[in-house]
């Protein structure tokens, strides 16, 4: 059997305050596409969407699709979203471990507000403050 999810390598730098609030993220994400690019270039926007689940403050993400001599991967459900979400959660766990805080506390402090959600998701419908 061939296929599977695309492996990624991420090199990142994250800025944060002593209370766990993240102020900036700079990341370089390399997607291993295998010998054939196939669906891989379409993963980039989905991967970015997975990263946007937290309010990073200032965010700079550079994603590269890397053609290698390995077997190609295929598209699976939510291609890119899983990798982006995993990267985001790994960074939050790293911040929590560095500060000695509970990871859920750090995650909660970095969830979007209505205003930050409008900045990170400008082309979508973001509801008002009622019930948010």
Briefly describe each language-model feature range.
Residues 1, 32-36, 113-118:
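Flexible loop/turn segments at secondary-structure boundaries
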Residues 1, 23-28, 104-112:
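Beta-strand segments within the central parallel beta-sheet cores of soluble alpha/beta enzyme folds
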Residues 2-6:
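Short glycine-biased active-site loop of nucleotidyltransferases that positions the nucleotide triphosphate
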Residues 7-90:
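Glycine-rich loop/linker segments at domain edges
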Residues 75-132:
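N-terminal leader/propeptide and maturation segments of large enzyme subunits in energy/redox metabolism
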């Amino acid at each position: 059997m061939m296929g599977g999810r695309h492996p990624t390598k991420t090199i990142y730098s994250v800025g944060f305050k002593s209370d766990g609030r993240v102020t900036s993220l700079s990341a370089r994400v390399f997607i291993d596409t295998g010998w054939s690019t196939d669906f891989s270039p379409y993963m980039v926007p989905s991967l970015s969407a997975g990263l946007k689940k937290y309010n990073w403050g200032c965010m700079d993400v550079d994603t590269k699709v890397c053609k290698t001599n390995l077997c190609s991967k295929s598209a699976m459900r939510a291609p890119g979203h899983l990798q982006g979400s995993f990267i985001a959660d790994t960074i939050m766990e790293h911040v929590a471990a560095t500060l000695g805080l509970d990871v859920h506390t750090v995650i909660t402090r970095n969830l979007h507000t209505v205003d930050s959600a409008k900045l990170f998701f400008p082309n979508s419908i973001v509801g008002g403050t009622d019930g948010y």
